[in-house]
Structure formats: C-alpha cells, structure tokens
Regions:
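Binuclear metal-dependent phosphoesterase catalytic core
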Residues: 17-18, 23, 27, 34, ...
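Core catalytic region of metal-dependent phosphoesterases/phosphodiesterases
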Residues: 2, 15-110, 175-184, 208, ...
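Active-site environment of divalent metal-dependent phosphoester hydrolases
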Residues: 10-15, 53-59, 81-89, 109, ...
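Short, hydrophobic/glycine-enriched beta-strand segments
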Residues: 2-8
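Generic enzyme active-site microenvironment
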Residues: 6, 49-50, 78, 162, ...
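His/acidic metal-ligating clusters that form di-metal
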Residues: 31-45, 69, 130-199
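Conserved catalytic scaffold of divalent metal-dependent phosphoesterases
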Residues: 9-16, 84-171, 228-237
Length: 238
C-alpha cells in the first residue's frame, strides 16, 4: 500500500478557475487527475491536507468532491483556510463519497498507520493580533485532541500528521512540540504557494520529518510518502 499526499487543489466549484493566478494553473486538476490515475491503486491512500474547493457552501462543493471521490484510493481530508464549504463535521462526512474520510479532532487507522491532524494557523510572532493568537491556541488544542485519539487507537502504531498551515518555520517552533510529544513520524502540510514554497521547512526537524505538498510546488503531481520513489521536482512558481 502506497501513501501519497497533495494539498491546495483549489477546485473551481463551477466558477473559479485557478489560471487567474498564472498560466501554470491552466488545466491543473486535469494534470493532477492524469498523474493520480497513472500511479494510485485502489488499495493506496491519498492525503489531502486542505483547500480542496472554492465552494462557499457544502452543496456547492458536491461536484468537486465527487470528482475526487471518483479517483482510485482511499482519501483522507483535512480542512484548509479556504474550505468555507466545510460546515459541521457530521454534515461533511455524510456528503462525502464512499472511500473519503474527513478528520476533525479525531484520528483514523489505515493499513497499520494512524492519521491525525488539524488545520493549524499562522504562527504568532511578537506583533501577532490577539485574534490570531486565540485561533492559534485553539488549533493547538485541536491537534492535541486528534493525536490523543490516535494514541487511544494504538499506543505504538506510527502516526502521520496532516496540517494545512505550516506547522513550524526556521524561526518559530509552532506546533512541533505537540507532534513530537505523540511520536509523529511524518507531517504533511500545504497552504504555501509561489516563492514562499522555497522557504518551507522540509526534512527532519527534531524527531519529525516534514513534507511540503502544495500542488503547484509539485508540478501538479502527487507526492509519495511511502511505497514508491519520492518526487523531488519543485517549481516554486507564483
């Protein structure tokens, strides 16, 4: 069983194409879909850490969710900052096609590996707004709840964490202390685009290996976590 990851698909919800952000986004989901169909088998897992659709309401996200659901593999979803369609977790889960799972304050075991995570937030610096600090602290609690649930499922199974926002930077430790506390082996995240991708944290920091998986930084191909040769190509286009 291979495990892949890709974030920030930003599917159009019928009326918001991504090529307004640059020609490299033209036909981006068709490129992702072609790579997905070429590589992913029914028994594989694909992690989708946020910003799936521009839809504003759950009903409007249906076409985008069905488009992902029709692709092979088990899909594990996490909310991003632009997933405005993501309403109550119960409604979201009822709306998902078969083989798609949404994480929120909990965890999932697939193929002997645990999956947990939370959206995260902008890491607060010394001049951070009070509201940002409040949201950041709430996301820390949600991440811990998810990882606690993972450890209730298994004390020794490996954990892969999903986050949307970067969990740390070269200057800020961010969420890394919580990830290390629960023995997370790998953490995938998205959110960044364009030149910001170049400065993203990758590789082992502390006891966790970090993977930046925004789709435009992967040339609109899936990133391989386990079970295949990893993709090294980075575009860093705006």
């Amino acid at each position: 069983m291979a495990v892949y990851a890709i974030a920030d698909l930003h599917l159009p919800a019928g009326n918001k194409p991504m090529d307004i952000f640059g020609d490299h986004w033209i036909g981006h989901f068709e490129r992702i879909r072609a790579d997905w169909l070429d590589r992913v088998k029914p028994e594989d897992v694909v992690l989708l850490p946020g910003d799936l659709s521009w839809a504003m309401r759950l009903e409007e996200a249906g076409e985008d969710l069905r488009g992902i659901g029709a692709l092979p593999g088990t899909k594990v979803l996490l909310r991003g900052n632009h997933d405005y369609w993501w309403s109550s977790i119960g409604r979201v889960r009822r709306a998902l096609p078969e083989g798609m799972y949404a994480l929120q304050n909990d965890a999932l075991m697939l193929g002997g590996r645990l999956y947990a995570g939370s959206r995260g937030w902008t890491l607060p610096g010394p001049d951070a707004a009070e509201e940002d600090v409040k949201i950041y602290n709430r996301e820390r609690m949600r991440l811990e709840m998810s990882l606690q649930h993972a450890r209730r499922l298994s004390q020794d199974a490996p954990i892969t964490a999903m986050m949307h926002f970067p969990p740390l930077t070269d200057e800020e430790t961010g969420f890394s202390d919580i990830l290390e506390k629960y023995g997370v082996s790998d953490c995938v995240y998205g959110h960044l685009h364009g030149p910001a991708i170049y400065g993203a944290v990758r590789g082992v920091r502390g006891a966790v290996r970090y993977h930046q998986v925004s789709c435009d930084g992967l040339d609109f191909r899936l990133y391989t976590l386990y079970g295949d040769q990893p993709i090294e190509k980075m575009t860093g286009e705006a």
